Structures are given as structure tokens and as C-alpha cells.
Amino acid sequence: SRIGEPSLTSPIQGTITFIIYRRHGAVVSDTPFFSQLSEGIDSACRRLRYHLNICYLYENEDTEKRIDEIVAAGCSGILLLGTEMSEKEFAPFSRLEVPLVLLDCYFENIPVDCVLINNVQGAYLATEYLIRTRRSQPGYLRSSYSIQNFEERADGFYKAIRAAGMCASRSV
């Protein structure tokens, strides 16, 4: 084992709760991305000798009650997958005293640790690649679900279209 890392015989350090928030469940589902994310979290928790609880929280539930139950169960920290979450839906989590990291979501007005994908840059680079290799204007298929990630990807796409001197209105 490496210096500073607990060995496999070390006692459990605590419990991390991975909360998957689902507003409609259409975005956060059983896809390879979310499966790999869960597996990576599980692997890191085991390596660091933390027990992992996975909990689904739905929009129509009593969020504050569920949070209280999670904390009362002895939670050492929370990883919150907020892909489908709005700033208003995050509000009950802001009062927590246990460490919390927000995954795949960011709220400009709330001071919370986050782990994000750079959606704007990713969409920009992908669009730039398509323009360079296809030498034609790509189209953009947009989801009917409004989440921050999708808005950021659209922003990156349209920035690349404009940077290439193309008409954004033709990219329907």
C-alpha cells in the first residue's frame, strides 16, 4: 500500500452517501457514463476504506426529511449527482454540516465544492472538429429537457458555428 493510504485491513473510516437526484429520470439513467461514475466512486471508497451508500432522491419526495434520515444514519459525507437539479432544488442541501461535493452541476450563487465537465469547451471542440473534417455546417439536436449541461453544450456549439463564420440559425 502507498504511504497515507489505508490498507485493506484498516477499519472502515466512515460512510459516504452518493445521492442521485432525479427530477424526471430522463437524463440520469442507466447509461455507460453514470454506470462508470458509480463504479469509480465505489472503487475509490473501497480503496480509502469508506462504506458507500447509494440513494436515489426524487423531485416529489420530502427532500428535507430524506436528508435528515441520511445524516442521522451516520453519513460522513455526501456526493450529490445534481445533473437534473435546479438551484431551488439544491436549497435543502445548503444547510448541511457534513462535507458535500456536487457532481455534474454548478450553481453560480451557491458556495459548494463541485466536480464538472466543461460542456461548453467539449461541444465547441466537437463542433469545430465536425466543421474541419466535413467542411459543412453541422446541425444541432436539442433535448426537450432543460438542464444546465444541455444549455452549456448548445452555447459551445453555437460559439463554434459563429467562430467559423457560419449562420447559427441554419444549425437547426
Please report, for each region that a protein language model flagged, where it lies by residue:
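Helix-enriched interaction subdomains in cytosolic or periplasmic regions
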Residues: S1, M85, L102-C105
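Amphipathic helical "hinge" segments at domain boundaries
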Residues: R2-I67, G74-S76, Y158
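Structural motif
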Residues: L8-P11, E69-I70, F93, L130-T133
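Bacterial carbohydrate/catabolite-sensing allosteric modules
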Residues: F18-R23, Q36-L52, G77, S94-L102, ...
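Glycine-rich nucleotide phosphate-binding loop and flanking beta-alpha elements
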Residues: V27, M85-E87, N109
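Conserved strand-to-helix beginnings and helix N-cap segments that scaffold or border functional pockets
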Residues: T31, E64, F90, F150-A154
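Short beta->alpha connector loops
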Residues: L57-E61, L81-S86
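Catalytic-core regions built around general acid/base machinery
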Residues: R66, K88-E97
